[in-house]
Design a protein with these regions (language model features):
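FIC/Doc superfamily catalytic core
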Residues: 6, 10-326
């Protein structure tokens, strides 16, 4: 019974810890009393002090000031790595979700440069997979490597396009990309989207160093390859866009969009860890929404292009479950 009670206390403390971190995410520099008033269920001040002290020791929370003026805020690391219950988040209606509705200007210049995106255990898993990839690669001829990349290109083109609402099956995609055979009952735009993916991936394979360092111009070039003949405006957008399914409103000022992308390039190019480079490219290009359409397509291809540039195994995204989402 004592052991069960101790386990219940630990579980309760963990729940309270998550609530504290989530509260501080949206209410930085809060007093302990303010934090306690928002934590459910109600706990004693002694317990609250102990849990906050644990958060400070773990590097999740910073203490600002002393005595009655003491305030608490999240560390940059906790801003990105604190636990988040996705099921609870998506169970709420859009207007009930707690989100930052405007662009976070501190993210790229303040938070991301100061944090590690992967733990040592996560990096060990990634580099274990990378070691197997390199071993597999060393046993291939140039022709076999190209065929392997062709297969991965088909998988990635299909999945990336499916995420955008494309209805081609994987088999139909293979026929289209290998034999230029369009599928009956499908639109021309769907075929063009898939062929554009192939062109972008072929370009990266032919110029493997192209994305070793990324730039605004190179991001725009990959975007142009992915969206050609689809009626999508080239280069940075000049008008406001909205995103279905969220109250987040991307930047609507061309100069701020340009600055955010350029800052992202500096951040990514300055990182030494390749997996961090690829992940940052994936999330930041998607977050900034610099183009009227094709943002996530561009992010997925550039992320893979970075992996390829450094001799790392690209990702097909095949295991992702398809849901309707904005581009």
């Amino acid at each position: 019974l004592r052991r069960q009670r101790q386990m219940c206390i630990r579980d309760s403390d963990m729940t309270t810890e998550i609530e504290i971190l989530q509260y501080l995410h949206y209410h930085p520099l809060s007093k302990r009393a303010d934090i306690g008033s928002e934590v459910t269920p109600e706990i004693s001040d002694r317990t609250l002090k102990r849990i906050i002290a644990d958060c400070v020791e773990k590097g999740y929370v910073e203490v600002v000031g002393k005595g009655p003026a003491t305030r608490y805020r999240l560390t940059p690391q906790a801003h990105l790595t604190m636990p988040l219950n996705l099921d609870t988040y998506f169970d709420k209606d859009i207007d009930e979700r707690t989100v930052q509705e405007s662009f976070n200007f501190n993210l790229i210049r303040g938070i991301l440069p100061a944090v590690r995106l992967f733990t040592d255990d996560e990096l060990a898993i990634l580099y274990g997979a990378q070691s197997k990839f390199r071993q597999h690669l060393s046993e291939m001829t140039d022709l076999e490597y190209r065929k392997e990349m062709e297969r991965l290109g088909i998988d990635l083109s299909w999945k990336s396009s499916q995420i955008e609402g494309n209805t081609y099956s994987l088999l139909e995609t293979e026929r289209l990309l290998k034999e230029k055979q369009t599928a009956s009952g499908k639109t021309k735009e769907e075929a063009v989207m898939l062929l554009n993916h192939k062109d972008a991936l072929d370009f990266i394979l032919d110029e493997p160093d192209y994305l070793k360092e990324i730039s605004l111009g190179r991001i725009e070039e990959i975007h142009a390859l992915l969206t050609k003949e689809l009626g999508v405006e080239r280069n940075i957008r000049h008008r406001r866009v909205g995103i279905t399914g969220t109250n987040y409103q991307p930047l609507d000022n061309e100069f701020q969009i340009r600055e955010a992308l350029e800052d992202s390039c500096l951040l990514i190019n300055g990182k030494s860890e390749v997996f961090e480079k690829a992940l940052l490219a994936l999330v930041l290009i998607s977050y900034i929404q610099a183009f009227t359409d094709g943002n996530k397509r561009t992010a997925r291809i550039i992320s893979n292009g970075i992996l390829i540039a450094y001799g790392h195994c690209p990702i097909s995204f095949l295991s992702l479950i398809h849901i309707s989402e904005p581009t």
